[in-house]
Amino acid sequence: MFKINFFLIAASILILGFSSVSAFAGQNSNYGGFYRNNNKPVKIVSGVNMPGQQLGISMLNAEHAIRYLKSEGKKYSIQIVFYGPVVKFLTVSHTEHNRLLNFLRSKGVSFRISGNALMLNGVNPKNIPHFIKIIPSGTLQIFKKIKDGYTFLIAM
């Protein structure tokens, strides 16, 4: 019970925090100076663990971020990390996802996929597109990127 209440409180704080960001962003196109330094790339890591809506929203978020950052002349580094059941939908046989992944890759997005998730979901690593790097753990990759200064973006 305590864990559920804690989760609900944390989620409420995040929702309230994000709702105020959009109002601020509308007033200040420089996002409070976040993008002021042109020499440092904007670093984003996105975690995707579910197929369907979360996967689609994460891809759209990356595309929109790239479009905005390029229009402002900003450098960026974006990595999408796949873990959990979504790995079943990232094999070479899923051509609809591969087209979108290749498009984002052409824009400089890098992809990582959890070896743990591949094993737990019965996916042969040989069936993963060559441009998606297999890593031991998706969760640990996200933690590493956060430590390296990346902003964590997750679609729910």
Segments (PLM) and residue ranges:
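Acidic helix-start/capping segments at beta-turn-to-alpha-helix junctions
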Residues: 76-90
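Solvent-exposed coil/turn segments that connect beta secondary-structure elements
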Residues: 51, 83-86, 116
